[in-house]
Regions:
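Two-component/phosphorelay signaling modules centered on CheY-like receiver
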Residues: 12-39
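Non-catalytic signal-transmission and effector/linker regions of two-component phosphorelay proteins
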Residues: 1-7, 14, 157-158
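Conserved phosphotransfer cores of two-component systems
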Residues: 47-49, 73-81, 102
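Helix-turn-helix DNA-binding segment
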Residues: 150-175
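A short, hydrophobic beta-strand element within the central beta-sheet of small alpha/beta folds
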Residues: 74, 80-93, 108-109
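Conserved phosphotransfer microenvironments
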Residues: 54-74
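Short, flexible helix-to-coil linker/hinge segments that flank and couple to helix-turn-helix
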Residues: 100, 106, 111-157
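Acidic, metal-coordinating helix/loop segments flanking the phosphotransfer/catalytic sites
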Residues: 20, 35-53, 61
């Protein structure tokens, strides 16, 4: 992987420090050009220098919609910048959909395996929809539920038998 520039946006000081440590120890190709603990700190950083990657916490300032809006605006103004969401939002799947629709290149949950060089490399190489194990498990679980529901619906339709009344009614409609 070639060298790239990153801005880390994280509102919890301890998590910011840990994320910076992951980048410095595990992803030496990353040059950290700035960190922000809020949306207000992020935009001036971006004006100084546009990074190749923004690692963005979804729940800035306790509001989950701020991360989505930051992503949407960033991708609107700088579509070439990769955005990797690094979040603790485990249960709010709608947020995952919202941020992907806003242009995020991937989502890594802070639970489970942390940020890895493989994930970052995939995003930097242009791969979309980069997820770690907890997200993939949730996606597969939801997909399985949807398939089972759809199969039950189809089976219900197939098992329906027409009786004499249904036939007469359909003939009447056809006339």
């Amino acid at each position: 992987m070639k060298q790239f520039k990153v801005i880390i946006v994280e509102d919890v000081k301890l998590e910011l420090k840990g994320t910076m440590g992951i980048f410095s120890q595990e992803i030496p190709e990353a040059e950290e050009i700035g960190t922000a603990m809020s949306e207000a700190e992020f935009w001036p950083l971006l004006e100084q220098e546009v990074p190749d990657l923004v690692l963005l916490d979804l729940g800035l300032g306790g509001s989950t919609t701020i991360g989505v809006e930051v992503c949407r605006r960033l991708k609107g103004e700088h579509p070439e910048v990769r955005v990797l969401i690094f979040t603790g939002e485990v249960t709010n799947e709608k947020l995952w959909v919202d941020v992907l629709e806003a242009g995020a290149d991937g989502i890594i949950l802070k639970t489970g395996e942390l940020l890895t060089q493989v994930d970052v490399q995939a995003v930097m190489e242009g791969k979309r929809m980069v997820f770690n194990q907890p997200i993939l498990e949730k996606i597969v679980e939801r997909f399985s539920q949807a398939v089972r529901t759809d199969v039950r619906r189809q089976e219900a339709l197939i098992q329906y038998e027409m009786d004499e009344y249904d036939e007469r009614y359909l003939r009447h409609l056809a006339v």
